[in-house]
Amino acid sequence: MEPAFGEVNQLGGVFVNGRPLPNAIRLRIVELAQLGIRPCDISRQLRVSHGCVSKILARYNETGSILPGAIGGSKPRVTTPTVVKHIRTYKQRDPGIFAWEIRDRLLADGVCDKYNVPSVSSISRILRNKIGNLAQQGHYDSYKQHQPAPQPALPYNHIYSYPNPITAAAAKVPTPPGVPAIPGSVAMPRTWPSSHSVTDILGIRSITDQVSDSSPYHSPKVEEWSSLGRNNFPAAAPHAVNGLEKGTLEQETKYSQAPNGLPAVGSFVSASSMAPYPTPAQVSPYMTYSAAPSGYVAGHGWQHAGSTPLSPHNCDIPASLAFKGMQAVREGSHSVTASAL
């Protein structure tokens, strides 16, 4: 009687996946094989797959059985509670013992014989599943017993410790609006940048420390220096241009004379074309000054017709102002020197 449900194989036969072939069909396969019929012809006649026929005939030739299942039955249980207990004892005595050493111990102590001793993989599975958690708990307890008392943690930045301890007054530093308040246990007075800042790496901090230690007065810190910019310095007077009075320059430009045949001079003159100013000689205030009165100029300089190409501001310098005052000073210094000798 064929089953009412199942699948159809490549030969048109019906089989149920996951269930063994019925014993009647198995016996018929063996009988046809003993009659000398080839396995391929048996599979076509009984509409059973080639692999199934070959497997049943091979098992019958090896064991003489046509029944399904493992050949000879399953292996008897070897991981008995007694064996597990001895394995736990070995592991507690020597936590670093290997599975093959436990297997040898079981044979040496007579717990098992060579027929029922567990394999190395079975012992490893027992250690991992049944004894692993207990062994880890025992190691943790023993570690806690032998662990020394916890030492206080090092404070932050212990290499460059702060000179004064953190007090309640220091913790109450006001914070600007919009910035979240720092709790008292975290807030600390800032005296210098941390050890990882650029100022500490470059050695600026040691210089400021020496200054602050040697001087009783308050010295600005490095972070205060960085706040100083160009805006803090007084700006130059708006009426001065390159150190010269703007009013004087405007007057010279306003009353400049027409060119007298010489090429025009721009507003910029290179430094190489200008002669250096002579340094006036030092004259003692207790000596008489014998400069000639002709060294003084009565009129304005821009009213003279003569000019020189050394005018740096697009105006002409009178030729009569050939530094007569400087020449008079030189003459006066020579006369004073001669009189002193």
From Swiss-Prot:
Query: What's a single GO MF annotation on this record?
Result: RNA polymerase II cis-regulatory region sequence-specific DNA binding
- Specify the superkingdom: Eukaryota
rRNA processing keyword on record: no
Q: Which residues bind DNA?
A: 4-130
Which pairs of positions does the record mark as disulfide bonds?
none
What are its GO cellular component terms?
nucleus
What are the subcellular locations of this protein? Answer: Nucleus
* Name of the protein this chain belongs to: Paired box protein Pax-9
UniProt organism field: Callimico goeldii (Goeldi's marmoset)
